[in-house]
Amino acid sequence: MSSRYQQPFGKTKSAIKAIASLVSNTFSRQLGRKFMSFFLAGAIISVTMAACTATNPNSGSPDAKKDVELTLVSFAVTKKAHEAIIPKFVEKWQKEQNQKVTFKQSYGGSGSQTRAVIDGLEADIVHLALAADTSKIEKAGLIDKGWEQEYPNDGIVSKSVPVIVTRDGNPKNIKDWSDLEKEGTSLITADPKTSGVARWNFLALWNAAFKKGGSDEKALEALTKVYTNVPILTKDAREATDAFFKQGQGDALINYENEIILASQKGQKVNYVIPEVNISIDNPIAVVDKNVAKHGTKEVAEAFVKFLYSPEAQTEFAKVGFRPVDESVAKEKQFVEQFPAVKNLSTVKDLGGWDAINKKFFADGAAFDQIQAKIKR
């Protein structure tokens, strides 16, 4: 037994001797000896157990649980929302489950985050820009099939829409997607081959052109005009934003509504329009089943994901520009004013789902490559 357990036992020796003496005087010598042997053994065991219990530094509340750590991997623009939400969940979980939760957080482009998880970044939870990225992790064997049905809204926990950012005063009078087809209108956007945001941009343009022209041929023609007006395709949305704002390139920029709202909150003056025919940018959440099984974090990971759908968490998403998926939050006056209704809003499902979309638009030789070939970029 270590030294920290010996002191309480030592203090009890005199008490044991006194009791033993009393027993000896009360009973006969033979009976007393037998009784005292049993009594001393029991007393020593009892006192030793009491001493160990009293001084063991690892003992605490009988309901206390071992600390747990979660790794959250998400796309870059969610950082501010998660930094506000995580402390609320940690406090709630500690109060309800008597368990301390800490978070490791990683933020970056959705595509690069997807590759990192597949290559070994042991995320417990992934919150990505598009379901196609989550599906890649599923196909790598890390997420179980059917993850979309595990949580409300087909796993979509945050939403936005593409908007067109213009120069101060909108000198090119850009009001809709079709205005980006006009000769002499320079557009800044990223490459859909490398950027998740740019894929949403492309789909918004295609969706509007198809509904206006009524055929794939008309849509392809319209988007060829649009991309002819793009001087250079940047690698990602951040480079596109820098090219427009910092370098002064282009007459227009396509970006997430939430990015523009956040920029406005930081004091940056931004002029933008929300086209009436648009597409919902849906961002999914998923638990990485293989990793939570390895880490023993399934229970708390699932609880955190469920918490993200709560009005409390959805309010934090809305504060930084994401359209809430919780209807009660969406109906709050401040958010009704912040997020104008879009008259004709399509979804990925309306376009056939991500497998069909990737095959039709972004695979080698598909629509985007055909457009690039026509303009000989």
Question: Which ranges hold each PLM region?
Answer:
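Extracellular/periplasmic juxtamembrane helices and adjacent flexible linkers that interface
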Residues: 2-4, 292-377
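Bacterial N-terminal signal peptides that target proteins for export
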Residues: 5-39
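C-terminal motif of bacterial Sec signal peptides marking the signal peptidase cleavage site
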Residues: 48-51
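N-terminal segment of the mature folded domain
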Residues: 53-194, 367-377
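Ligand-binding cleft/hinge of the Venus flytrap
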Residues: 87-97, 178-243
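Short secondary-structure boundary segments
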Residues: 130, 191, 257-258, 320
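Short helix-loop capping/hinge motifs at secondary-structure junctions, enriched
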Residues: 169-175, 194, 207-215, 291-301
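Ligand-binding pocket segment of bilobal, Venus flytrap-like solute-binding proteins
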Residues: 212-277, 284
